[in-house]
């Protein structure tokens, strides 16, 4: 080996030694981000995702090249812990919401205290593997000898910073541009956060989310342009045009009793296990009612509160976080408000903490005169997260009798809440081979709630309270998280499941019962929680001005739009997180046509219209003009 070669080798080794902490940080964070990606998407390991992940870490690393090694080692150690905690939070959030946590969602973190059992059940011991390197790094840091390379002057540090930053930014820009070219509105709308994370990596996602949050806050502090306001007004006017004749005014003057059932998912209806009906009472009442068997939930970060929000306002959930929390200062043209204009009394019933999901604020905002919350009930029996559905419905019935007619009463149940671990409270129900599984526990929980709902509805009928009342009952959201999809597929005898098999099971039951069991039958129209208020507005002869949904009884449209950008028109189903279309009848993949592409862009526009309405409190402005 000649002297020149030896010189360059020594120089290379010195540079490696001088930057060993940066190299080690890059490798550790890369492994962690890739492991997270594998957890949210089994097909995550593909060549394209390496580039944005490495680039995002290079951008982080570049800033630390300006510091002395002794100082930056400590800073990198702290950053490693911070990123690890973010990844752990992300994966726990994903297990329940099937989404990536955002800055807006973090604002709702205090709400998790009310469902601590749910959160704890989502934590896996393996999650702490994200922190395992910390254990080994502490002793290594103590023994690590810092290099005092006096030759490394400030100018060289700046050059290294610029070079590392430019390489990272160049690679990152290419990756982000490729995504924006494939789906032009994805980055600005964040409509499908899982797919975006899959394409550009977790660090990039959170950086873009933070940027969007800040820029949106700044943008929303200014008034929306007159042109944009007019565009939204024109859409609302067209969407709410109606020449409805089917059941128009059929419920006018009648009481409305609306029941939102916790985690009531559609697959349990008319289903048996070991020869026993899972929901015998709901099955019986469905046969006496108008039943909608293709009714989808569309909740996002607000979960149960989103179901309430859509059903009472026909506006989409917040882009991020919960509308009940983020937009409690807005004005609404809610179902309760419009019924009050017709001299209805309005009351909401839910036995959980009044402040949970900000209900104590949002119920009055939406026009409810009374809110019977936790402190309005005698907590004499607990099942699940709080007061049992049995006691809740019995006490609610007594309160209903005191309301001046006509009234709108909105009841939200609780006992069948995830993680369905109160099997003793649920009582005996033989689930056979599913004993001890999450699905088995859920079947016990929903069977219990079904029994209480049956008793409640039977009492309403027996006491002739249904003679002048419309009853609406629907499920709020999914029961089986995607982490447990194999249990659901096994129960439904589905082999080689596709993404379409998953999405077609994201339906919830919804039925409308009329006095004397009138208008009973099955409506197969593809519909959703966004469509409930417009449908009831037609039946109760209420004004329709600010609704983004459709009247199911007077529409042949199968439009259902989900917050993540997925949609169906009743014929095709677009799954946004894989950018794939399926034929609804056959379940087979189909190619994107120009018509489907145009629909996708239009539906994303409608989501953005809803966001603008909420962000700029437009209903207040529209009503004032």
Where do the PLM segments sit?
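Generic alpha-helical structural element
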Residues: 74, 101, 118-129, 221, ...
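Short alpha-helical interface patches
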Residues: 106-113, 122-132, 205-213, 362-384, ...
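Short coil/turn linker and secondary-structure boundary residues
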Residues: 107, 123, 224-227, 239, ...
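Generic structural signal of hydrophobic/aromatic residues within well-ordered alpha-helices
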Residues: 12, 30, 112, 119, ...
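Low-complexity, proline/glycine-enriched hydrophobic segments characteristic of transmembrane helices
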Residues: 209-223, 230, 574-575, 581
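Short coil-to-helix leader/linker segments, especially the first N-terminal amphipathic alpha-helix
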Residues: 219-245
């Amino acid at each position: 080996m000649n002297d020149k070669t030896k010189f360059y080798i020594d120089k290379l080794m010195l540079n490696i030694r001088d930057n060993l902490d940066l190299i080690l940080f890059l490798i550790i964070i890369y492994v962690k981000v890739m492991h997270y990606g594998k957890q949210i998407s089994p097909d995550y390991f593909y060549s394209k995702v390496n580039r944005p992940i490495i680039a995002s870490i290079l951008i982080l690393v570049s800033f630390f090249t300006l510091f002395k090694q002794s100082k930056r080692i400590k800073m990198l150690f702290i950053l490693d812990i911070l990123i690890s905690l973010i990844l752990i939070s992300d994966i726990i959030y994903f297990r329940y919401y099937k989404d990536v946590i955002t800055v807006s969602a973090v604002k709702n973190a205090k709400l998790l205290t009310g469902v601590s059992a749910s959160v704890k059940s989502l934590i896996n011991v393996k999650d702490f593997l994200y922190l395992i390197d910390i254990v080994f790094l502490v002793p290594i840091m103590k023994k690590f000898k810092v290099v005092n390379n006096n030759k490394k002057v400030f100018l060289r540090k700046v050059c290294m910073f610029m070079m590392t930053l430019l390489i990272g930014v160049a690679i990152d820009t290419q990756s982000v541009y490729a995504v924006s070219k494939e789906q032009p509105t994805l980055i600005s709308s964040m409509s499908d956060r899982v797919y975006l994370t899959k394409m550009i990596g977790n660090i990039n996602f959170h950086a873009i989310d933070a940027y969007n949050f800040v820029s949106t806050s700044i943008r929303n502090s200014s008034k929306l342009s007159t042109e944009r306001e007019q565009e939204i007004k024109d859409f609302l006017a067209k969407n709410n045009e109606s020449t409805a004749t089917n059941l128009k005014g059929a419920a006018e003057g009648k009481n409305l009793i609306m029941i939102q059932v916790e985690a009531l998912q559609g697959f349990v209806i008319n289903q048996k296990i070991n020869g026993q009906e899972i929901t015998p009472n709901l099955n019986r009442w469905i046969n006496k009612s108008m039943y909608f068997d293709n009714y989808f939930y569309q909740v996002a970060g607000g979960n149960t509160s989103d179901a309430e929000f859509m059903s009472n306002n026909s506006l989409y959930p917040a882009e991020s976080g919960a509308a009940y929390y983020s937009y409690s200062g807005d004005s609404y043209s809610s179902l309760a408000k419009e019924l009050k204009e017709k001299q209805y009394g309005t009351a909401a019933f839910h036995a959980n903490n009044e402040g949970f999901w900000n209900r104590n604020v949002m119920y009055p905002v939406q026009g409810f005169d009374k809110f019977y919350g936790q402190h309005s009930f005698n907590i004499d029996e607990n099942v699940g997260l709080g007061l049992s559905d049995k006691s809740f419905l019995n006490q609610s019935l007594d309160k209903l009798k005191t309301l001046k007619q006509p009234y709108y009463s909105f009841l939200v149940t609780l006992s069948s809440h995830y993680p369905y671990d109160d099997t003793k409270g649920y009582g005996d129900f033989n689930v056979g081979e599913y004993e001890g599984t999450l699905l088995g526990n859920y079947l016990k929980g929903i069977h219990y709630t079904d029994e209480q709902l049956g008793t409640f509805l039977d009492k309403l009928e027996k006491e002739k309270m249904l003679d002048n009342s419309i009853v609406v009952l629907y499920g709020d959201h999914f029961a089986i998280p995607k982490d447990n999809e194999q249990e659901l597929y096994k129960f439904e005898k589905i082999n080689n499941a596709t993404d379409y098999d998953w999405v077609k099971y994201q339906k919830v039951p919804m039925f409308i019962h009329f006095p004397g069991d009138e208008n009973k039958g099955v409506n197969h129209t593809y519909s959703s929680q966004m469509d409930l208020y417009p449908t009831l507005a037609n039946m109760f002869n209420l004004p329709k001005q600010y609704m983004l949904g459709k009247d199911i009884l007077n529409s042949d449209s199968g439009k259902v739009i989900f917050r993540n950008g997925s949609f169906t028109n009743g014929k095709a189903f677009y799954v946004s997180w894989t950018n794939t279309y399926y034929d609804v009848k056959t379940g087979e993949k189909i190619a994107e046509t120009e018509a489907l592409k145009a629909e996708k862009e239009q539906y994303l526009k409608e989501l953005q219209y809803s966001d603008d309405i909420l962000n700029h409190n437009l209903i207040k402005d529209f009503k004032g003009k």
